[in-house]
Amino acid sequence: MVTRLTLRIGVVVAGLAVVGTTAQAQRRVRGGRAVLVDRPGVGPRVGYDFNFDHAFVGGQLNLPVGRRWTLVPSAEFYPGATGSPFRLNADLKFHPPTVYGFFYVGGGFAYLHQSGASDAGANLFAGWEGRRARPFKPFIEGKFVFADNTSFNVEAGLNFPL
């Protein structure tokens, strides 16, 4: 059963995806100076779900929609767990204006599925993303998933520019 909140979150995420498809990952001019916008990226992730008490693997796609904003759709699978559980996420990540831009916060929509049952909810997360000068960017984050059961996850992974 889809609640009104879930439907609203889905509409917002779909709208952001439409806006994000026209964004170009290149230098933009702001006030007479060039501003670097990250390129889209893709990468693997691993983590641990403390509520489910199980490790998971997955991947994500990073789609910059602005100088500090990134749309991050991702999928996480729980190998070896009963019922073949998985989670699909559509998150929006924000890098606040800090000295090096390592820290980020965000939130979004979560769809959870296990043994024929599904649930929709929301994510809130904060994390650290490595230096942008390398050919890849490592990250680590803590994520709260608010659905039928609230869970806390610790995740880590790499992002490779496309």
Annotated model-derived regions:
Residues 141-145:
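C-terminal binding/interaction regions
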Residues 41, 45, 104-106, 125, ...:
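Short glycine/serine/threonine-biased micro-segments
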Residues 1-35:
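Cleavable N-terminal export/targeting peptides
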Residues 10, 15, 20, 106, ...:
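Small side chains
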Residues 24-67, 71, 77, 94, ...:
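Short glycine/proline- and aromatic-enriched beta-strand/turn motifs that initiate or cap beta-hairpins
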Residues 58-138:
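Gram-negative (and chloroplast) outer-membrane scaffold detector with strong preference
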Residues 150-162:
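Outer-membrane beta-barrel "beta-signal"
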Residues 35-39, 50-54, 81-87, 115-121, ...:
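Transmembrane beta-barrel outer-membrane domains
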